[in-house]
Amino acid sequence: MNEENYLDEIILEMIDQVESPGATGAVEATPEKKRDEIPPEERTIYTGLKIEGLWIEFEERFFLGGRFAMMIPQFFTNMDEESAKIKYPMEQRPETILTDPTGAVNFLLSDLEQEITNDDAEMVRDNLLTIMRRVNPGIRPQSTGKEIIGDKNVAYVEFSNPTMDGKLYNLMFFLEAEGKALMGSFNCPTKSLKYWKKPAFEMMQSLRVIELEIIN
């Protein structure tokens, strides 16, 4: 399979999935008076966030054999294989599929196996967004942009897409790591967008690429 067909398969299968948003689930941490005293506008994923009335703690986790790190909600767990096969039925599923207890809020991470440079992140995003919109006209891009995180160019796109149970909000981002393209994707029901948009961006901004040292 050539590189273009491989990328097309990943994108087509991901956007063709049937999601079941449901209510956002979370594990409530014990509120502390000191934490409650932090003004809402000053709360971040590093202080803990109150989302839909529940305190959510975040922690840094490592992925892709320790090559990539990112802050993730503590209650996110690996999606079980049965659910992953239903939601992401393609043969080449994302290496990382994390979800909340209800399966409504998800984070995915994929090595696209495409050779790129640090300057190509926006090109990869634009090409894949074109593919996605061509096969799914229901996709509604909301914004695109680029942030420099560490020394990496990280290109992102926000969009919504319809599902059988309602619309999903997606924050998808692309970057180079060890010469290959990585794609991260956060999604949640649009009805939960006001709670999750800020932490979704903070999660993206927390990413770290750990370059492996070559020992001669």
Residue ranges of predicted features:
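N-terminal targeting sequences that direct proteins away from the cytosol to non-cytosolic compartments
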Residues: M1-L108, E113-D119, N127, I131-R140, ...
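Short beta-strand segments that buttress and anchor functional surface loops
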Residues: A155-T163
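A short, hydrophobic, proline-anchored segment that marks a local hinge/packing element in signaling
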Residues: M172-E176
